[in-house]
């Protein structure tokens, strides 16, 4: 079932196959969200002040990459909706090739690259995914590889 686009309510490791693809709903990023996140977690001028940000290399306000990562996580979790939750084992190759700006609509595309039973936790399996976050113009704003521990059906 390579390239199958799945929509299900609750997923277990047993439901997942290499090549399965998932796409999230859209998420609108607002100026208020960008500034509030930056004030708490990444207080750089191009995340905090519209006027000052216009004088930077970005020529305007942009979201922190970490804010983009947090939005990606939210959309990923909502879309895959793992039964009992999934435990993140790590992220590799995290990239932010284009900035996220106020008003952008983000969507996450996830593809399962590998699946295998866990050797140490027999009631779980390990999946490897590629997550790509795009804006409304189809521009890639974040990519990453992720691994997660997912429960099997009992």
Regions found by a protein language model. Give the residues of each.
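Hot-dog-fold acyl-thioester-processing enzymes
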Residues: 2-90, 153
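Conserved interaction-surface patches within small, structured recognition/assembly domains
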Residues: 92-94
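HotDog/MaoC-like acyl-thioester-processing domains
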Residues: 3-18, 96, 100-154
